Amino acid sequence: HTDHSFVEKVLECYTKARNTEDLAELCDASSIVTFRRTFLRLFNCPVAQWLRQKRAEQVLKLLRTTHLPLQEIAEQCGFANQSYLSDFCKRNLGDTPVNIRRNKIEMKQ
């Protein structure tokens, strides 16, 4: 793998990965240790942190730009159910999905 093809493969596969192991497998990595090391070198952060950030960006985008039901957003972002989405938002974004969406709507007015 060249560095460029590694990055391309990660960007192509990350939306289907729930964790580091999933992403390594989707990227056809022969070793999880080597995958983590290469990822850290090229992305300048651990895999799990990067995946969490990407998921947070996706959640925010859907909450702020769509009127999709929260269950649909949960499914699109890889959460088992709406409760996991809510927990993720509270932990990583500082508020509930409903409040994040409401605050965005209020800011537009």
Say what each PLM segment does.
Residues 22-30, 35, 39, 73-80, ...:
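Append "Primarily bacterial transcriptional regulators
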Residues 1-19, 26-31, 102-109:
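Inter-domain helical "communication" segments and dimerization helices
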Residues 21, 41-80, 102-109:
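Terminal helix-turn-helix DNA-binding modules in bacterial transcription factors
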Residues 4-19, 39, 43, 60-69, ...:
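Basic, amphipathic alpha-helical hairpins
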